[in-house]
From Swiss-Prot:
Pfam family of the protein (one): Methyltransf_10
Gene Ontology MF term list: 23S rRNA (adenine(1618)-N(6))-methyltransferase activity
Keyword line: Cytoplasm, Methyltransferase, rRNA processing, S-adenosyl-L-methionine, Transferase
Protein name: Ribosomal RNA large subunit methyltransferase F
Taxonomic superkingdom: Bacteria
GO BP terms in the entry: rRNA base methylation
Family (UniProt): Belongs to the methyltransferase superfamily. METTL16/RlmF family.
Xref: Gene3D superfamilies: Vaccinia Virus protein VP39
């Protein structure tokens, strides 16, 4: 029986339960990580980090033509359906200005990560071109290896090292560059202790032992920063003012709804002309991203016309 997942974007390829037989045919290594649930249904052992990685590898190969994908131990292994939702809702946002989704959009992924997940999905689904920024040498090396291992990706995805860990756009967006949008999955904890506590909650929910590796992993720069998510996004908002004529839409995920009011205040103080919130849901998980622009309707249309 094929049950639809509530809340996913209509164009999301993961509307229904995973077809494990098809995924195992695409990626045979997934077969060794299948288990039976108490109800007798076949499933993936989500408490096993290697199983989650094998599932991601299969999903990317089966749906997005990514034939070679791997990440080093300890890095975030992102749930593909949720990441795809961000891309599809971003496409809708970009399409609102002209009435159609742009086929040649240029996107900046702030903190592309070892998994390179957003560019992989965006290139396949919409033919977009991506620049990915990264502060971690190890993450950048992993993302670069994925790009080089898959035919055609090097023409669509380029990576830039963020040499200043205190900067977000500065040093990445060059003087004469223009982007249709930026996207970001920001660090959400405000300390290493909070990140560990969050990992422990996930571990308990998955029924893992204390010594087990957490299935979604995460390096320091992926999980926490001083002041947490609100401080990081406020910094992004402040810095975005310097690039107000080079970027059409700045966007970022916001993990908690209660974080929105201080961010809205920061956007008003920064002079954002329009602010949009896109709600998303994957099963029981609620998420959202906010988008802001410093251009009015006419300026946005002119920006797109000039850029094309």
């Amino acid at each position: 029986m094929s049950a639809q997942k509530p809340g996913l974007h209509p164009r999301n390829r993961h509307q229904h339960r995973y077809d494990l037989a098809a995924l195992c045919q695409t990626t045979p290594e997934l077969t060794s990580f299948l288990i039976r649930t108490p109800a007798g249904e076949q499933s993936v052992d989500f408490a096993n980090p290697q199983a989650v990685k094998a599932l991601n590898k299969a999903l990317l190969a089966h749906f997005y033509a990514v034939t070679h994908w791997d990440i080093p131990p300890g890095f975030l292994c992102p749930p593909v359906p949720g990441r795809a939702d961000y891309i599809h809702h971003l496409a809708d946002l970009l399409g609102e200005t002209t009435g159609s989704i742009p086929a040649q959009a240029t996107i900046l992924d702030v903190g592309v990560g070892a998994n390179c997940i957003y560019p992989l999905i965006g290139v396949h689904e919409y033919g977009w071109r991506f620049t990915g920024s990264e502060v971690s040498d190890a993450a950048m090396s992993s993302a670069q290896a994925i790009i080089q291992a898959n035919t055609g990706l090097s023409r669509a995805i380029r990576l830039r090292r963020q040499k200043d860990p205190a900067a977000i756009f500065t040093g990445i967006i060059h003087k004469n560059e223009f982007y249709d949008a930026t996207l970001c999955n920001p660090p959400f904890h405000d300390s290493a202790a909070a990140a560990r506590a969050g990992s422990e909650r996930k571990r308990r929910n998955l029924g893992q032992n204390k010594d087990d590796a957490l299935n979604f992993g995460g390096q320091q720069q992926e999980l926490w920063c001083e002041g947490g998510e609100v401080a990081f996004i406020k910094k992004m908002i402040a810095e975005s003012q310097s690039f107000r004529r080079q970027v059409l839409w700045f966007t970022t995920l916001v993990s908690r709804g209660e974080n929105l009011p201080p961010l809205y205040r920061a956007l008003a103080e920064a002079g954002a002309v329009k602010v949009v919130k896109k709600e998303m849901a994957q099963g029981q998980k609620q998420s959202r991203f906010i988008a802001w622009t410093f251009m009015d309707d006419d300026q946005r249309r002119r920006f797109i016309t000039r850029k094309r």
